[in-house]
Amino acid sequence: MTHKEMSEIFAVMLLAYPNAEVFKGGIAKLGPTINLWVTCLPEIDFWTGQQAVVKLVRECKFPPTIAEFKEKAEKVQAEVRARIDQAWNYLKLDMGLGKTPEEAVARLPEGTDIRRAIEAMGGPSRLIATGERTFGDGTVKTYEYYNYDGFKSAYETIIRQTSALNSGPRKAVGPGMKQIGGKT
């Protein structure tokens, strides 16, 4: 994560925890702290950091430590991997039972993230890829394999386009709900 991106994460925490001692003086005085966080969290990308900070703000009364932030970010990454693997296993099971990729995809409900990922890959036919293997005697054999890497990349892109895991954009106030201040 860059310093600018970490500053955005800290801006969210500043809003969530305005009375915390660490934020006295605002973002301008947090330079060394932000440098430390960036140095300690090189493996966390901005999107994962955003998801982690949203979850932490919902769950914690106090600003998180670097270790708590990293732990939550790792949980976000694990959730993404689990979601991708679950979708892939569903597709692979159907294809393993003799269904073509087109038949496996046809069973999926319209508008799902899995379908959008497959469309982003270039269609159901891209779920199976072709490779070549050269043997020691110079013979070349063609083989087919499940294109997990292509699916994983496309599905992760789709997940990252949504505002939070397992949800789309949320309305702040639904019909009949009261806002803060009592207005409907």
Where are these regions (language model features)?
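Charged interaction scaffolds used for protein-protein
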Residues: 1-184
